[in-house]
């Protein structure tokens, strides 16, 4: 899947110290394409494979490069501004976009670009980081956090205040993985590298 794209990302990451403004500009279309793949669910930082999980390190590399191609900027809405490099996932959404998404997004939710939100998911006021995957029918309850690149399966309940750890570096580190049909209790913290098996 996306072998040419992967090769370009790998090459850019291996030579990241030498990337100048022109090189970063030239790389932006590939990085935006990766973000779109993550948001659509067509690519995942970690995916089930042969009874286990495979980490796609090149997607983590793309996320790290994505940070480099953005300057800090004011975002959000009047009266509630943010100062960040990563755009909000839903900042340009209208009613039709939300209908297509098929998830419920309650006021107070912060989801960053590059996060996947499955059909019939419910996001109470919570935080979903870049590269995270929230499966279909999953509820992320109030003040819960799904960290960068964390993978949450379908029909899960991430209870109020729970933290699902995120990890971008080291690249080979496995993100936190919550498989399908799991209940994570209130105020629980599931840290990087932990896999909670299917419920």
Q: Which role fits each region the language model picked out?
A:
Residues 99, 103-197:
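Structural signal for interior beta-strand "rungs" in well-ordered beta-sheet cores
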């Amino acid at each position: 899947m996306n072998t040419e794209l992967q090769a370009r990302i790998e090459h850019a990451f291996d030579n990241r110290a030498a990337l100048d403004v022109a090189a970063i500009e030239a790389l932006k279309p590939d990085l935006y394409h990766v973000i779109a793949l993550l948001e659509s669910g067509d690519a995942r930082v970690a995916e089930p494979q042969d009874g286990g999980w495979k980490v796609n390190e090149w997607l983590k590399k793309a996320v790290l490069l994505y940070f480099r191609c953005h300057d800090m900027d004011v975002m959000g809405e009047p009266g509630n501004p943010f100062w960040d490099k990563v755009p909000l996932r839903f900042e340009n959404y209208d009613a039709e976009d939300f209908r297509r998404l098929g998830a419920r997004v309650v006021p107070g939710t912060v989801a960053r670009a590059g996060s996947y939100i499955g059909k019939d998911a419910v996001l109470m006021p919570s935080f979903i980081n870049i590269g995270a995957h929230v499966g279909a029918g999953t509820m992320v309850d109030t003040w819960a956090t799904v960290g960068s690149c964390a993978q949450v399966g379908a029909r899960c309940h991430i209870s109020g205040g729970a933290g699902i750890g995120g990890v971008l570096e080291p690249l080979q580190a496995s993100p936190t993985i919550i498989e399908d049909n799991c209940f994570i209790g209130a105020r629980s913290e599931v840290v990087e590298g932990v896999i909670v098996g299917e419920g």
